[in-house]
Swiss-Prot record:
One of the primary rRNA binding proteins, it binds directly to 16S rRNA where it nucleates assembly of the head domain of the 30S subunit. Is located at the subunit interface close to the decoding center, probably blocks exit of the E-site tRNA. GO terms for cellular component: small ribosomal subunit. The keyword RNA-binding applies. This is Small ribosomal subunit protein uS7. Part of the 30S ribosomal subunit. Contacts proteins S9 and S11. One of its GO terms (molecular function) is rRNA binding. It comes from the Bacteria. Belongs to the universal ribosomal protein uS7 family. GO terms for biological process: translation. Keywords: Ribonucleoprotein, Ribosomal protein, RNA-binding, rRNA-binding, tRNA-binding. Disulfide bonds: none annotated.
Length: 156
């Protein structure tokens, strides 16, 4: 365990094309093997496709998709007297954002379209319309928290 305490949070640099820190976060989530230019090409291509299909600002589409995917509750395992309970807890805003981006990227990778640009664009559009696997994941998370509501008093 480090003795200095937690590392300070570094501020996110705004993305050079859209001027949004959300786009920077998305690029960093797509990033594999340090290939940032490839990740940027994928994200910018997907946002451009989203602009062509909707005719609106792609950053607005991204924000709407994130709002539809962000969980407000999740379950955390808590051990009490030999039994492990799934305790529902509220999700902090930063974690909700991170989870939403992670789910969007993972479910985009699992899609069947030919290129990653198409997959990400379609997942973003589906999520912004309240459809898609990432929105279903959020609903499942909320359902799990709701069904374990009886253990909410074990929160810490």
């Amino acid at each position: 365990m480090p003795r200095k305490g937690p590392a300070p949070k570094r501020p996110l640099i705004n993305d050079p094309v859209y001027g949004s820190p959300l786009v920077t976060q998305l690029v960093n989530k797509i990033l594999l093997d340090g290939k940032k230019s490839t990740a940027e090409r994928i994200v910018y291509g997907a946002l451009e496709q989203a602009r062509e299909k909707t005719g609106t600002d792609p950053v607005v589409t991204l924000k709407r998709a994130l709002d539809n995917v962000k969980p407000s509750l999740e379950v955390k395992p808590r051990r009490v007297g030999g039994a492990t309970y799934q305790v529902p807890v509220e999700v902090r805003p930063g974690r909700a954002n991170t989870l939403a981006l992670r789910w969007l990227v993972n479910f985009a990778r699992a899609r069947r379209e030919k290129t990653m640009v198409e997959r990400l664009a379609n997942e973003l559009l589906d999520a912004s319309n309240g459809l898609g696997a990432s929105v279903k994941r959020r609903e499942d998370t909320h359902k799990m928290a709701e069904s374990n509501r009886a253990f909410a008093h074990y929160r810490w």
